[in-house]
From Swiss-Prot:
Protein encoded by which gene: Pde6
Protein name per the record: cGMP-specific 3',5'-cyclic phosphodiesterase
Species, as recorded: Drosophila persimilis
Domain GAF: residue ranges: 290-442, 474-658
Cleaved propeptide residues: 1274-1276
S-farnesyl cysteine lipid sites: C1273
Lineage per the UniProt record: Eukaryota, Metazoa, Ecdysozoa, Arthropoda, Hexapoda
Compositionally biased intervals (Pro residues): 109-124
Entry membrane topology: Lipid-anchor
Function text: Has a role regulating cGMP transport in Malpighian tubule principal cells.
List of residues binding a divalent metal cation 1: H768, H804, D805, D1023
Predominant subcellular localization, coarse grouping: membrane
Subunit structure: Interacts with PrBP.
Residues of the active site: H764
Segments of skewed composition (Basic and acidic residues): 129-140, 1171-1180, 1221-1233
Keyword Hydrolase part of the UniProt annotation: yes
Amino acid sequence: MHELGTRQRPLSSSSSSSSSSNMTDVSAAAGGATAPAETAATSSSASKPLTNGANKTSTAMAAPTTTPTTAATAAGAAEAGAIASVAGISNQVKLEHHHRQSNNNRPVAPYPPVPAAKPKPTPTPTAESKFKSTSREVDVALRPTPARSSTISPGVSIHTQTIQQESSSAKPGMSSSSSSAQQDVDEVARLFEEKPEAFEKWLTERAPPEALSRLQEFIESRKPLKRPSVTSDLFQQWMSASPTVQQKSPRSLSNSSASSTLPECRRHLMDLDEGELFMELIRDVANELDIDVLCHKILVNVGLLTHADRGSLFLAKGTPHNKYLVAKLFDVTQKTALKDAVTRASAEEIIIPFGIGIAGMVAQTKQMINIKEAYKDARFNCEIDLKTGYKTNAILCMPICNYEGDIIGVAQIINKTNGCMEFDEHDVEIFRRYLTFCGIGIQNAQLFEMSVQEYRRNQILLNLARSIFEEQNNLECLVTKIMTEARELLNCERCSVFLVDLDCCEASHLEKIIEKPNQPEQRPTRAIMPGDSFDEKKMRNRFTVLFELGGEYQAASVSRPSKTELSTSTLAQIAQFVATTGQTVNICDVHEWVRDHNQIRAESEIDSTQAILCMPIVNAQKIVIGVAQLINKANGVPFTESDASIFEAFAIFCGLGIHNTQMYENACKLMAKQKVALECLSYHATASQDQTEKLTQDAIAEAESYNLYSFTFTDFELVDDDTCRAVLRMFLQCNLVSQFQIPYDVLCRWVLSVRKNYRPVKYHNWRHALNVAQTMFAMLKTGKMERFMTDLEILGLLVACLCHDLDHRGTNNAFQTKTESPLAILYTTSTMEHHHFDQCVMILNSEGNNIFQPRTTRTFLLLARRFLRFDLLPFRAFTRALRPLVRPLLELDVLELPDPSRIFLLTVYLRLVTRTIFLPPPEDEEEEDEVEDSVVLVVASVVVVVAVAASVVLKAELDVEALSPEDYRSVMKTVESAILSTDLAMYFKKRNAFLELVENGEFDWQGEEKKDLLCGMMMTACDVSAIAKPWEVQHKVAKLVADEFFDQGDLEKLQLNTQPVAMMDRERKDELPKMQVGFIDVICLPLYRVLCDTFPWITPLYEGTLENRRNWQDLAEKVEMGLTWIDHDTIDKPVEEFAGCADEEIKDIEFTVTTLNCNQQAQHGAGAGGDDSHTPEHQRSGSRLSMKKTGALGKAVRSKLSKTLYNSMDGSKPKTSLKLLESHVSEDMDDKSPTSPSQPPHAGGSVGRMSASSSTSSAGTVVDKSKKRSKLCSLL
């Protein structure tokens, strides 16, 4: 029955007809002891739904046959009978329940509603049988039924509701009462509450599918905050894969089943008055979201309201400048089924432009048109009548507007069916009022349809995004999938993708990929006008691959079109136009567009082409890498702006997919090239065998001969080979070779390889690594810090010191970041340090360089070499039999043997091969045949088993002292942490934590975090240990560091066009002493001071740094006064020579430049200076008088002094130069005298000592120091 006929409303308590109807229902349920009129009313109510119209009809029919008195009597009797029957039923329920409880094992017969014959005994039902027999009642109980109001007592109302539920849900053959059914349900429910596992078992094993579905519906209906929305069940149904026509709303599913029953379902609506019918029809379309179902309901309901014969509904489509009407449903009558109407409209789509025809005029003017005689109106088109044979008399056409007043459709009804020849004003008013509500419903349905389309689009785009990662190694599959999705979503006939040949497929494109892409620019989508043109010279043969996808059942094709095919194909020329201009083209008429563009030749392939949508495909750099093309929509209409928007998303994903695939191919190529480069690098980075053998055979001197235990070690006197021998001595002296069973040749090869991988830069070279490693060795041995370290940690620290600057390029991390070098891209933090560690790992992984390899493998290699020397295989037949047994073990690894076993068997196999090749052939072939095959096989098998067992046993014995995997990971972790700690940024991060531990008196450094902090501080102390070397070593090393920094500054000026910092600016080289003092105060002295406080055995590092600070401070002050220039190759002569003096005058003078107040030094003597020399420089008072501060050495004097010194280099006039110097200094010294001559002299560290005559010094000539100083002062 139709939904409108089954809709029930709450009955009014004041309605007499409603009370009468309820009473008759109760009487019928009680047994029928009522008057015939009541029985008739009961039967009428049972056969017809309880609607207002039905109640009115039944009352009207009963009125002529009864008088008022009779009716009142009948009503009273009915009410009394109802009360009595209810009381009887209540007692019957109590008795039956008591009987079931008192005798639960005997058969129980249901009590009839009225006295009847003796009931037939039945067996006692179990809980499971009750649930099976009452599954329909359970279903009724699970369904939420709204309560109905009534004027009767609550018990009667509930019973009435139960009877209505039973009468509406039970089949005609059911004989069980509602009370007994309810009791069965309650009993089964109690059983399931007591034993929920039984209920779960029944649901999983024996529940029928329909019961599970109803239960699921009930659970879903009980969810809180359930309201109709885009996330409702209807929306979920719509989003399924079924076609839209099959997605009916729940209220319309029963309506479209059979067209013959449709008039019967709606016949009861004729009994409603006009107002109720109008509201009922509005409710019918209010919540409908299926646009097809909604339009069908609108036409059917309008025909019912206006008594029209048939109707049509048109929806507005197109752009604001090109609107037209599309017939959604056409000629729908009261008997037309939904499926037939939709099928007929889809088969022949009717398009009416605005302003054409009756519907077009209504859409354009927004005014209603009521035609009384259609054939007399010039706007009427009678062609449809001629085709169908139907005669149109009256037409009423009215616009459908949204809430803003815009036209969204037009509704048209034809011919009246109630005998009238035309539509009157009443019909027009009803039509207008109803379409007002229909406009709201149509717009909601369209919005819902758009949301569904958007959801489908998003799902497709998500699938495409997923496909980009799934098909990144197969471009053909990826493009085919994208084209298939685009063709199905946009409903077009063909789809093509043209790919452009770019250099992005080459590995050299990697630098372009690394660059950050700019923001993508928006490209407007517009239709190509006839006046648009382009330069024919810009069209080039750029397409190399063409993907084509035809109809639904056609497979995709991939081809490489030739130049001739591209030049003769119209579609290809249009694609070239898009690739050249970078614009999206939407061609409505291809033939007209080709005629307007003379450069493009029209071919026969466009005869069947009507519309084309063509769009460029760009990559991240906004470079056109292809063109996507859609051809002909399935319904023959042009591509809309919405189609272009959707297609743009496909083009973007296509570009992403193509770009990603190309980058994946490039990455594969680069990885292959990287493997080749690493192989070549590993070969060239490894030391040669000749060098390794030579170093292996060299004698290694003792550590004392290399001065390895001293903190004053210098490498200036060592040749390159001696540096390698010194490294080997450190490993031997720490007992690392014997402790970890490191093969001596492997260690030699590794040392030579490490030296080979250092670049010949000025400071961060192999000798710097040697000095760092020697300082670590001295700290461990002389500084007694090895007692805080394990042997494994000592090994890791020495390896880290030697490898901490591998492949250093002479530039720091900041320079790598500024220039955006590949290293800076590869490592974001501690760039060079990570690279040094990677180089260290690369060398260790090179063949023959892994000093951390397990001992068992090396042992079995030695066993293999020894095995080859013995002659264990006397028979040729034996070798032939044993060889096929050993070879599968080596190739297939059937026994899953460990590495030593495989090596041992490989040795056996090699021995068999060599014996087979080099053994002379037997003199007597028959003697060889005498050996039985079975004996040979048995002996060969025994040899294999023994070899495997022996290798396993030997491995178990030798693994005791091997470097286990845990030890290997531990030593590699130590090496990595130590190398990264040489980054001063890491030092500053760890320094505060280390200082806190030292200040708290920490003495246990065995924890993992504390040990890591200690190792990091030790690595930094070793890395900057050149600052603690003797002054004659330190100032040379400082000059090397400065030169390397100056080279980086030159690169910054040249490449980056920026001004470098002071320490890297060659023009500010005179500030080097001052910068050295700052470096010592900020980094070196605090580090060495805290280390000395904790480990007093390394005090020489602190003292040497303090001494060098005094020297740098003095030199910095002399630079400020102009007495020296930092422009030599090395700073071994910080003060200029007095080349103008005669040799005989300075023959025995040892120039000692300490301070400029030489007279005070002469007065106080060496004792005062010696006492003060032990006081740290930065702790002394600033009482020392400087000629710079007093102005004793003016600018003019310094200029003349400079000229005198440099002009006297040739020694032509030494005496004159000396006198000139003396006169200038004396004049200036007389003008400015010291303010406090009694102050103690400043004991800054001596900058250097220069002997004027080495022969005199060697002869042992004794010179008075005070006399020397006096002579020097007299010269000044």
